């Protein structure tokens, strides 16, 4: 396609692409153009690579007017690697854009504005990613094995030798890992390596589609000893993961404010950013404002990340999770921290929960909801139904709900139900910059009911 423009960029979309709009010959607004690499306030020349009747997708060719928020990306692989999409934007501007995405979704999808916009939660911009899934490919044309993230909008693996968002000691492992995998008998049968960094242990889970040989075992042991890491193997599905070497180490992360240590497996869901998780926990518990005599409910509780801190503030906490394995792990973590007498856990499918199911749980004073990207639609509908039933059923509704979200669109959808149909008000909302340099928007909202 030929170079086109100039085009004024007015905003960013959910993938951090600049958004501009063409003007028709009669002066009316024309189609939208999504421009990779362009920032709000910039005027650019662009080249389209996909043209549709109502929009075009393009890349920047030349920047005629540059945004004051544009910075030089720290990573030399930015633009090729798909792991980050916003390194060219100042970190404060990144947070501001994410806050606007949250507020726009709440308004456009639910016609809601929070009573209070919380100050954003932010932390380190680099070296924060303590959990990641790296793809492995043997590519003869590139000289051997590649280990890293996918190229942007591609199934190919980026030829990367470092990563600025991984902890430095993990970034330094990328090249040695390429060399290690190249020496293994299963070099063509290892599609991914999963990374989990704990307080004192770094674990790498090798997805081995075939059994490893004795020679492979020796290579892995030597590598683990030299680089001070722990290898796990996953021959089949997630439930087949087991520690290979060394066996005397346990992954943990800590929540010092609450005196809690959380053991976990490398394939468990844990927050990617441990520093932000601590700040998020502190703010969530303050907003929950649990009293010593309260009964609390934690939905989508995972391994007990919120449940256990909540138990240090209240009389009783119940955690509900859809995974039997995570429910078992949460119970073990409660015992590990001496909180098993104040906590209970149940495995339920929260995507199919009904009003009767919620009523059967009994009265809880305050709830915390931390769903995956799909949100908590069934839970929100159940609360709306109980509210509209009136009488004793409505009395079961909690007076306060803290909703931690990793998808502002599903948060907005659920917020609409909670406010317009369940009788809550949106007391506050704000973003949590859990994933700097990406377009991922984590947020927290508070709902109150009189």
Swiss-Prot record:
GO molecular function terms attached to this record: 4 iron, 4 sulfur cluster binding; iron ion binding; RNA binding; rRNA (uridine-C5-)-methyltransferase activity
Binding site for [4Fe-4S] cluster: 75, 81, 84, 163
Enzyme class name: transferase
Signal peptide: none
Residue sites binding S-adenosyl-L-methionine per the record: 271, 300, 305, 321, 349, 370
Catalytic activity: uridine(1939) in 23S rRNA + S-adenosyl-L-methionine = 5-methyluridine(1939) in 23S rRNA + S-adenosyl-L-homocysteine + H(+)
One of the protein's GO biological processes: rRNA base methylation
InterPro entries cross-referenced by the UniProt entry: 23S_rRNA_MeTrfase_RlmD, MeTrfase_TrmA_CS, NA-bd_OB-fold, SAM-dependent_MTases_sf, TRAM_dom, U5_MeTrfase_fam
Domain TRAM: 1-62
Active site: 406
PROSITE patterns: SAM_MT_RNA_M5U, TRAM, TRMA_2
Keywords, sorted A to Z: 4Fe-4S, Iron, Iron-sulfur, Metal-binding, Methyltransferase, rRNA processing, S-adenosyl-L-methionine, Transferase
Family that this chain belongs to: Belongs to the class I-like SAM-binding methyltransferase superfamily. RNA M5U methyltransferase family. RlmD subfamily.
PANTHER family: 23S RRNA (URACIL(1939)-C(5))-METHYLTRANSFERASE RLMD, RNA M5U METHYLTRANSFERASE
Function statement: Catalyzes the formation of 5-methyl-uridine at position 1939 (m5U1939) in 23S rRNA.
NCBIfam families per UniProt: PRK13168.1
Protein name: 23S rRNA (uracil(1939)-C(5))-methyltransferase RlmD
Gene: rlmD
